Amino acid sequence: MSITITLEQDEALVLFELLASEKLEASVDTPERNALWALEGLLEKQLAEPFSPNYSELLQEARQSLLERYGR
């Protein structure tokens, strides 16, 4: 069984960066880590931005967009 999750582009990019950064690595158990790796892989397949030469700028814009939308 699978599910579908819909994210805005900026949400997906910021989430991908969090997962790829391994900031959560030490704080989760193996089953959760495996699920996060699967999610990271799915996002990586969908996003072009991480492979862009101006990735840092695109990521900063996405972060700013989320702050404006949801607040701090």
Where are these regions (language model features)?
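Positively charged, low-complexity terminal tracts
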Residues: 1-6, 13-72
